[in-house]
From Swiss-Prot:
Tetrapolymerization of the monopyrrole PBG into the hydroxymethylbilane pre-uroporphyrinogen in several discrete steps. Belongs to the HMBS family. The porphobilinogen subunits are added to the dipyrromethane group. The lineage of its organism: Bacteria, Pseudomonadati, Pseudomonadota, Alphaproteobacteria, Rickettsiales. Keywords: Porphyrin biosynthesis, Transferase. GO terms for biological process: protoporphyrinogen IX biosynthetic process. The modification S-(dipyrrolylmethanemethyl)cysteine is found at C242. One of its GO terms (cellular component) is cytoplasm. This is Porphobilinogen deaminase. Binds 1 dipyrromethane group covalently.
Length: 299
């Protein structure tokens, strides 16, 4: 019987909150296991003055954590699923996810409640090319400023007038207890499609660690695990990075069928392709691959 688990995570307030949510799930099934949080500073945390697509993509938020996992310095890692590239090291696996939080984006703005009502040539802070593509589609006149850092720092920049608005994920704001209806306005899926895996907390382990597999099997939220399969397959087949605007959102039509909306764009944001697929849960991965192939052919 395992007595303790070393859990690796980024050393940010949100990452630590998410890690404690995983620990709470573990404790429900294994109350006697001691869970030690191992905060790890990643390259993505250190480099804040450049867009992610210029410095290696979201994998920079995982590199050091995954290496610690491979080196057996930690037993499992907790990530935001949206930060995990389509392809991960062959010796690692996403073994569990928690129940998905609402994956919508949020317009954070003091004086306006929607992208459409922002003043002409307003400045939006964002570093995500997916959001940039949608913003340019909705309002080509808007200016987009590279905007990185944690949620608190981005909101502070907004409050001091550095930008007119920014876009953040609802899941992160909610977990930080930072969603304020006075200046946080939900954006519907029909306007901005979420990032692949947005709103999902993922647990990554070594493939050969049977003890961790047993724990992950207990805490895994199977409905969410099934939902993310077409999204992740889409991402994996595209082998996309932060320079490719892509999005995907899956939802259950009933107990056995999933509808997934996909989007694929170009860095210059001149073209966005959309596709919707409906599939049985048993063939959901194939659905994501099919969508990727068809959409690549349209580019």
């Amino acid at each position: 019987m395992i007595n303790s688990i070393r859990i690796g995570t980024r050393n940010s307030t949100l990452a630590l909150i998410q890690t404690n949510l995983v620990i709470a799930q573990i404790k429900q099934f294994f109350p006697d296991i001691n869970c030690e949080i191992v905060p790890i500073i990643t390259s993505g945390d250190l480099i804040q003055n450049k867009p992610l697509y210029d410095i290696g993509g979201k994998a920079l938020f995982l590199k050091e954590i995954e290496q610690a996992l491979l080196d057996k310095k930690i037993d499992l890692a907790v990530h935001s699923l949206k930060d995990i590239p389509g392809r991960i090291p062959v010796d690692l696996v996403i073994a569990a996810v928690l129940e998905r939080e609402d994956p919508r984006d949020v317009l954070v703005c003091l004086n306006y409640k929607s992208i459409e009502t922002l003043p002409q040539n307003a400045v939006i802070g964002s570093s995500a090319v997916r959001r940039k593509a949608f913003i340019k589609k909705i309002r080509p006149d808007l200016n987009i400023k590279v905007f990185r850092g944690n949620v608190d720092s981005r909101i502070k920049k907004l409050m001091t007038g550095e930008v007119d608005a920014t876009i953040l994920s609802y899941a992160g704001l909610k977990r930080l207890n930072a969603f304020n209806k006075k200046y946080c306005h939900l954006i519907e899926y029909s306007q901005i499609l979420p990032c692949v895996g947005q709103g999902v907390i993922a647990v990554e382990i070594r493939k050969d660690d049977n003890a961790m597999f047993n724990i992950c099997n207990q805490i895994n939220h199977i409905p969410t695990f099934e939902l993310i399969k077409p999204e992740r397959a889409f991402l994996e087949h595209l082998d996309a990075n932060c320079s490719t605007p892509i999005g995907a959102y899956s939802q259950y039509l009933d107990a056995y069928n999933i509808q997934t909306d996909f989007m694929l764009g170009k860095l210059d944001c001149n073209k966005i392709i959309f596709q919707t697929e409906i599939t049985n849960i048993n063939t959901s991965r194939e659905c994501g691959i099919k969508a990727a192939k068809m959409m690549l052919a349209q580019q």
